[in-house]
């Protein structure tokens, strides 16, 4: 009885691990999409709507997207200062 219980609990742990991996892998394409949408924004930087949208999307999907979106926002604000030439890279 205890052997069967431990095997079933191991099976549950594996299924939980798989579902976590799926959720993280599903959030990485959206973080790259938000990176692309900010990267190709005008020289003035991202609009407030884009920044708020990325932050709200990050709260709904996971903390990795929040960190990525904040770093991308900082990059787009400092990029025109460090590289004054405008346009997509």
From Swiss-Prot:
Pfam families reported for this sequence: Coiled (PF05710)
InterPro entries membership: HssA/B-related (IPR008455)
Family designation: Belongs to the hssA/B family.
PANTHER family, sorted: HSSA/B-LIKE PROTEIN 17-RELATED (PTHR31857), HSSA_B-LIKE PROTEIN 17-RELATED (PTHR31857:SF2)
Name this protein carries in UniProt: HssA/B-like protein DDB_G0295685
């Amino acid at each position: 009885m205890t052997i069967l219980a431990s095997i079933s609990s191991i099976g549950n742990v594996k299924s939980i691990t798989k579902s976590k991996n799926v959720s993280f892998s599903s959030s990485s394409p959206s973080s790259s999409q938000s990176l692309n949408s900010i990267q190709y924004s005008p020289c003035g930087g991202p609009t407030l709507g884009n920044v708020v949208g990325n932050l709200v999307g990050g709260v709904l999907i996971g903390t990795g997207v929040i960190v990525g979106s904040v770093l991308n926002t900082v990059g787009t604000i400092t990029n025109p200062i460090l590289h004054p030439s405008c346009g997509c890279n």
